[in-house]
Design a protein with these regions (language model features):
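N-terminal pre-domain/capping segments
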Residues: 1-93, 101-121, 307-310, 318-384
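Histidine-acidic metal/acid-base catalytic patches
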Residues: 2-17, 186-204, 208-384
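Active-site beta-loop-alpha junctions enriched in small/polar residues
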Residues: 31-35, 58-60, 96-98, 136-138, ...
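A general structural detector for well-ordered alpha-helical segments in enzyme core domains, enriched
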Residues: 41-44, 72-80, 115, 119, ...
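Acidic (Asp/Glu)-rich catalytic clusters
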Residues: 43-49, 69-92, 119-127, 155-162, ...
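Conserved, mostly hydrophobic/aromatic
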Residues: 45, 94, 123, 131, ...
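Alpha-helix N-cap and loop-to-helix initiation/capping positions
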Residues: 64-72, 103-115, 141-152, 176-184, ...
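Active-site acidic/histidine proton-transfer and metal-coordination neighborhood
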Residues: 100-199
Length: 384
């Protein structure tokens, strides 16, 4: 009986469902997971056809995380090379949600700073050139002092690291958040010593929620011109791409799928045709429902690539715009009702407060009048 001959192993090449479009100059991508090893973020990005991607360098809700395994770092570099990602320009990690470098409590600010610098050093270990984070909050303290503390800590961090650019993200504007208006970001950048090491990430949902109307091509261009005039075009380092579940100026950070929110598809068509936004990471952070996977990002990336070259009066574009708008109609109505109810409640509270203040002032005037009468009466008695 002849010996059994083992069939040679055939290496099967994996073909991702969504191929990367390497002909476009736009770096459309998404925030991907890195579970199981930081290198997995690279293949996850490839699988959805992303030309850029974001990831968490460690748990965004923990202060301390284990150091990277050297083998994982090596594999990260190899996969970036294999799949044609330049870590210096194509990757935009997102900082921890715990960070608040402007905290008025010194010990808490220092705790945030240690975690912040750890993130930056992880970036440099991975040869990543950009690092995005939320600027924090002044809490109950003085806002200008919080901006100064934030800038001071960024300056410290720059001196402790070598090349990674620190990218401040604009915010939706609720509470005492830093960065809900562009002036905050300008004020911080003005205080940075090495300005080559700082940049800005504009989030479409945050901008709209903070009151900047960018819902069509003209309004987007006006907003970008405002950014250029106030801060400077050279500082625009990345875009976070999200529609908004909340109306304009609602100060709510509620991301929505492209075209289904109050922004609508038009701004994303405008972005996909805005040459000045080429060659920087444009990263999706749209919600993934329980019954969905990261593949939804692959679909939205292809939508963005399809929008490139489409005009506002293109019949296919109009059909897609209306289709997505209809899909989000129910949620928009629900959030509009909540917003209107909250606005009405706040207006009532403000009116009540004004009325109370008016009553207090009237009582104070009456007391002042009584004091004057008493003083006059006493003076008259003394004179007599």
């Amino acid at each position: 009986m002849p010996p059994k001959v083992k069939a040679p192993k055939v290496k099967v090449e994996f073909t991702p469902k969504y191929e990367r479009n390497l002909t476009t100059k736009f770096k459309f991508g998404a925030h991907v997971g890195a579970s199981g090893g930081v290198y997995n973020a690279v293949t996850n990005a490839r699988d959805i056809g992303a030309n850029s991607f974001a990831l968490f360098l460690k748990s965004p809700r923990k202060w301390v995380s284990p150091e990277y395994n050297p083998d994982d770092v090596k594999k990260f570099h190899e996969l970036c090379s294999t799949h044609n990602y330049n870590p210096r320009t194509d990757i935009l990690p997102h900082g921890s949600y715990l960070l608040n470098l402007g905290n008025p409590d010194f010990e808490k600010a220092e705790k945030a700073y240690v975690s912040f610098v750890d993130d930056l050093k992880r970036c440099e270990l991975l040869n990543i050139g950009l690092y995005n984070f939320h600027p924090g909050s002044s809490l109950d303290g003085n806002h200008e002092e919080a901006l100064t503390r934030l800038a001071t800590n960024i300056n410290r961090a720059i001196k402790e690291t070598n090349f990674v650019k620190i990218v401040l993200e604009n915010m939706a504007g609720h509470g005492n958040l830093i960065g809900s208006n562009l002036q905050d970001i300008k004020d911080v950048i003005d205080m940075i010593e090495d300005k080559s090491r700082v940049g800005v990430c504009l989030d479409t949902c945050h901008s709209f929620a903070a009151g900047y109307d960018i819902s069509d091509a003209t309004k987007l261009e006006d907003f970008l011109q405002n950014f250029d005039d106030l801060i400077g075009a050279e500082y625009l380092s990345a875009i976070h791409l999200n529609d908004s579940k909340a109306p304009l100026g609602a100060n709510r950070d509620l991301h929505q799928k492209l075209g289904q929110g109050f922004l609508g598809l038009e701004v994303f068509r405008a972005i996909a045709n805005c040459k000045r936004l080429q060659n920087i990471p444009i990263v999706l952070e749209t919600p993934i429902e329980k019954n969905e996977t990261d593949e939804i990002y692959g679909e939205e990336i292809k939508l963005l690539e399809w929008l490139e070259g489409k005009s506002v009066d293109d019949a296919e574009y109009i059909e897609k715009r209306d289709q997505l708008s209809t899909a989000g109609q129910k949620e928009r109505s629900e959030h509009l009702k909540k917003y209107e109810a909250k606005t009405k409640k706040n207006a009532k509270a403000t009116a009540s407060k004004r009325k109370t203040n008016k009553t207090i002032k009237a009582e104070e005037r009456e007391n002042d009048d009584d004091d004057i009468i008493n003083k006059v009466t006493k003076k008259q008695k003394v004179t007599r």
